[in-house]
């Protein structure tokens, strides 16, 4: 029987293509709709577990065209979205794939442009992202209908003398908000340092990054240390 405690009101004004559950019970919904229960929400919305609108998920003007076909929530709470859209998301140009923060704001650290529909997104056990659809190109690289992407799917910050999300691992992005000395060989996805912050890699130690160092701070590689 239909669960009458799921309070969606008038529901959606057009097709729902995807429903994705978050670990906290909230519900991400993507499709071709422009409204949910009388509230303007273009192509994507997040609901509370009881079906009511989650107003903390702020998408602004949403998608200007196309549809949302697939949604994946990363371990760090960021959300990958794919579909047929090729206009803008809240005023910023996007083509078939983007990533938003847990609050719905566009994540400018991620960029992927596809020349055709993105139909499905999945994550492997080693945190690589596999995408499939009707595309032949991913950000200028020829890939026919399927591709695998490398990206950082988790983050830990060094602040107030501690890591905010556990010690560094190969799948995590490191963000330093205070001076720090890396005294043991450390593997990470990438590394960013805040302005005015200095991070030292001690002699005999390696900082091994999947991607790169970035940020406005200073990374010091001592004699006998290495970065790769």
Model-derived features: positions:
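Extracytoplasmic mature domains of secreted or surface-exposed proteins
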Residues: 1-153
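Extracellular beta-sheet-rich ligand-binding/adhesion modules
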Residues: 152-228
């Amino acid at each position: 029987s239909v669960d009458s405690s799921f309070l969606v009101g008038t529901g959606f004004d057009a097709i729902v293509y995807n429903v994705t559950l978050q670990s906290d019970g909230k519900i991400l919904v993507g499709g071709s709709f422009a409204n949910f229960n009388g509230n303007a929400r273009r192509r994507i919305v997040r609901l509370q577990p009881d079906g009511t609108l989650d107003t903390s998920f702020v998408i602004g003007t949403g998608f200007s065209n196309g549809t949302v076909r697939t949604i994946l929530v990363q371990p760090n709470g960021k959300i990958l979205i794919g579909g047929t859209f090729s206009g803008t998301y809240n005023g910023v140009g996007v083509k078939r794939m983007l990533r938003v923060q847990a609050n719905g704001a566009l994540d400018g650290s991620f960029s992927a442009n596809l020349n055709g529909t993105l139909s499905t997104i999945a994550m492997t056990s080693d945190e690589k992202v596999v995408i499939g659809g009707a595309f032949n190109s991913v950000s200028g690289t020829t890939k026919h209908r399927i591709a695998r992407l490398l990206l950082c799917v988790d983050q830990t910050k060094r602040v107030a003398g501690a890591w905010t999300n556990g010690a560094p691992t190969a799948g995590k992005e490191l963000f330093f908000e205070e001076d720090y000395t890396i005294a043991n060989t450390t593997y990470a996805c990438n590394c960013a340092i805040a302005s005015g912050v200095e991070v030292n890699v001690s002699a005999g130690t390696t900082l091994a990054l999947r991607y790169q160092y970035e940020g406005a701070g200073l990374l010091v590689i001592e004699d006998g240390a290495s970065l790769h």
